[in-house]
Amino acid sequence: GEAFDRIKDNPLVGEYNLILQENVFVDYDGHQGIAKAKGVDSTFEAGSTLAGHITNGEFSLHKGQLPQMVVGAGLAYKMGMNPAFLASAELYFPIRDRNFSLANPAASIETVRMRPSGIFSVNQQIDNDLIILPIEQMRKLLGYEEEVSGVELRLVEGSTAKDLRSAIKDIQKELGPGFKVLDRFRQ
């Protein structure tokens, strides 16, 4: 909407990224677990500093037309993921507008399949359960068309703590009480 357009125009905002995040079930080569899947837009992919934290493989969410994902080091270790392997991971999520069928459980679950292109390491909390993938794949998995669960902003280079407080105050005022505006430490 208009409020979000005005946020993009705020002189302190350097990057504006749409995200869609949800916990999903992951199956990779016989290993299963729960992960926090974060769908990101192409702006995130182009400007992310995550590329500097890749420990294996590369930071790439697309190989030609094929979607790929990057995985936190702790999760990759637990699931035996390696970008050098040909195995793909399957991400599962219950279909939102359908009752769960005991007779045919597969009909109640959406699935997306993709290979890990890279493993990243930022900190243990993030590394243990995060998968980053294209927002289009996340929308397909969750049954959404254009919805997002959040907007991540990065301030322009050289911004101070005072600039951060000012930006949070301005953005909160712009969006109103129905939205939470948090810095990365308060999330």
Label the model's feature ranges:
Residues 1-36, 42, 53-65:
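Hydrophobic, regular-secondary-structure patches
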Residues 20, 38-40, 56-135:
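Hydrophobic secondary-structure segments that place a key small or acidic residue at a functional site
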Residues 28-31, 82-84, 127, 145:
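Short glycine/proline-enriched turns and hinge-like loops at secondary-structure junctions
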Residues 93-99, 103-187:
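Mechanotransmission and gating elements of multispan inner-membrane complexes involved in transport
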Residues 44-48:
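Short helix-loop capping/hinge motifs at secondary-structure junctions, enriched
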